[in-house]
Amino acid sequence: MCKGLAALPHSCLERAKEIKIKLGILLQKPDSAVDLVIPYNEKPEKPAKAHKPSLEEVLQWRQSLDKLLQNSYGFASFKSFLKSEFSEENLEFWVACENYKKIKSPIKMAEKAKQIYEEFIQTEAPKEVNIDHFTKDITMKNLVEPSPRSFDLAQKRIYALMEKDSLPRFVRSEFYKELIK
């Protein structure tokens, strides 16, 4: 095995070391990893034509996840922060639910409901969100006859999780601190 590693280019070995470090951090107990910042080389995503928010707007985001999500610049910064922590699935699920509610066609709604369920809700889903068993069961029952409200309970649980967990971490992050400079 060592001969195989020695033959790899230096950049591959460096990348492997970075991944090993990140995985080590992720495998730590959550309490000890709360304030760790994982290095993230990309700059925060910024919408093409979004204006930089005022200091007053940015300060409001500390108190209101709604205001943060409604501001395109804030949304992009929050999304970049979550990506840096490998935890963007909650925001992606929330956005998928918002888009799902806008679907008018019952056929398209059923297709999208299945896609959301398979991507975020079912056990071992690629981007499985952290919801309790009761919420999962209710959501599954709602999908027998999909409606715009099929994911409401799960979406509310994930929103509350982002509000109580992700938002405070975002406000303590370098992403947010850069915005209030």
Curated annotation (Swiss-Prot):
Alphabetic keyword roster: Cytoplasm, Membrane, Signal transduction inhibitor
Main location: cytoplasm
GO molecular function, a single term: GTPase activator activity
InterPro entries: RGS (IPR016137), RGS_RGS5 (IPR034956), RGS_sf (IPR036305), RGS_subdom1/3 (IPR024066), RGS_subdomain_2 (IPR044926)
Compartment(s) of residence: Cytoplasm; Membrane
Gene3D superfamilies given in the database record: 1.10.196.10, Regulator of G-protein Signalling 4, domain 2
Residues in RGS domain copies: 64-180
Tissues/organs with expression: Expressed in heart and muscle.
Pfam family for this entry, one: RGS
GO annotation, cellular component aspect: cytosol; intracellular membrane-bounded organelle; membrane
GO biological process, one term: negative regulation of vascular associated smooth muscle cell proliferation
SMART domains, per the entry: RGS (SM00315)
Main function: Inhibits signal transduction by increasing the GTPase activity of G protein alpha subunits thereby driving them into their inactive GDP-bound form. Binds to G(i)-alpha and G(o)-alpha, but not to G(s)-alpha.
Annotated protein name in UniProt: Regulator of G-protein signaling 5
Organism annotation: Mus musculus (Mouse)
Lineage, broadest ranks: Eukaryota, Metazoa, Chordata, Craniata, Vertebrata
Gene: Rgs5
